[in-house]
Amino acid sequence: MIILLVGSGGREHAIARAIKNSPLTSKLFITPGNPGMQKLGECKNIPVDDIEGLCNLAKLIEANLVIIGPEVPLVKGLKNKLNNIGIKAFGPTAEAAMLLSLIHI
């Protein structure tokens, strides 16, 4: 399975490590990633708010699954757009992410 992981933080680093260790993973791409994540997958320098760039990368690498960590691409509709072009994505829709971003604890 070819997986694209969006993000560069500690949570995404932990997810990348788990994906890398899965026997189901044939290739892991990470964007934008960080220096420590380069050991786990191939990092591509696409900002998390570049929705078109992320969709184009997912098509180019023929991703079977995109895992979206940060809130910004979720609120901007990355999952919605990926689903519209036939690419499976893990994360809430833009509407659900927007609702979650409005909740203050």
Feature-to-residue mapping (PLM):
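Short alpha-helix plus adjacent loop in nuclease-associated cores
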Residues: 95-102
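Conserved small/polar residues in nucleotide/adenosyl-binding loops
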Residues: 66, 103-105
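ATP-binding N-terminal substructure of ATP-dependent carboxylate-amine bond-forming enzymes
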Residues: 1-95
